[in-house]
Amino acid sequence: MAKLTKKMKSIKAAVDSTKAYEINEAIAVLKQFATAKFVESVDVAVNLGIDPRKSDQNVRGATVLPHGTGRSVRVAVFTQGANAEAAKEAGADLVGMEDLAELVKKGEMNFDVVIASPDAMRVVGQLGQILGPRGLMPNPKVGTVTPNVADAVKNAKSGQVRYRNDKNGIIHTTIGKVNFSEEQLKENLQALLAALAKAKPTTSKGVFIKKVSLSTTMGAGVAIDQASL
């Protein structure tokens, strides 16, 4: 831990916390200090002009990033009949109904995303206490409860990110890996911010996207000058 602490101190010392960096400069800084032995993720924190205490101002949704996230996603689908075949053809890793529910109850959850057709919610609903705390419970607001499970599987596999503000009104998600090109990361960030802008609650007044910061898995946060986007 001492080495990590020393490294973090040096990174924070090199990043001007009072400055909003132009996007390409920010990405260059992130790449410079991404020296972990694995390919670090590039994460984003977006401070929104909302009151998270008000339910009608909470922001939640999903969008497909043009260049994906750089990570392989395992998808489980609760459905049956023709939809089950369509889900398999679309690339789902696990497809089932009661049999899949039994695996979940046993703690066998080797998947990152859960999708369900509406008729399967009678089964999935019984798994709320298991899936909910893990952020895996299907929800129509993010497109994971849908009659078109094949498209949902394709979206999940092609780099869809889900977002939801925390209690401080901040969205945290990933926009790729540090080995992505500057242009790929920039375009992914632009796609996310465009999706957030469309999701602005009608009751939210004033500046909606107040601050955007990027960081890598092991790095410090870098504030972004939104004018450079």
Swiss-Prot record:
Gene3D superfamilies reported in the protein's UniProt record: 3.30.190.20, 3.40.50.790
NCBIfam families for this protein: rplA_bact (TIGR01169)
SUPFAM superfamilies, A to Z: Ribosomal protein L1
InterPro entries: Ribosom_uL1_bac-type, Ribosomal_uL1, Ribosomal_uL1-like, Ribosomal_uL1/biogenesis, Ribosomal_uL1_3-a/b-sand, Ribosomal_uL1_CS
Superkingdom per UniProt: Bacteria
GO BP field: regulation of translation; translation
Descriptive protein name: Large ribosomal subunit protein uL1
Keyword Ribosomal protein: yes
Keyword Cell wall biogenesis/degradation recorded: no
A GO term from the CC aspect: cytosolic large ribosomal subunit
Subunit structure: Part of the 50S ribosomal subunit.
UniProt keyword annotations, A-Z: Repressor, Ribonucleoprotein, Ribosomal protein, RNA-binding, rRNA-binding, Translation regulation, tRNA-binding
Family indicated by similarity: Belongs to the universal ribosomal protein uL1 family.
GO molecular function: rRNA binding; structural constituent of ribosome; tRNA binding
Described purpose of this protein according to its UniProt entry: Binds directly to 23S rRNA. The L1 stalk is quite mobile in the ribosome, and is involved in E site tRNA release.
Organism: Pasteurella multocida (strain Pm70)
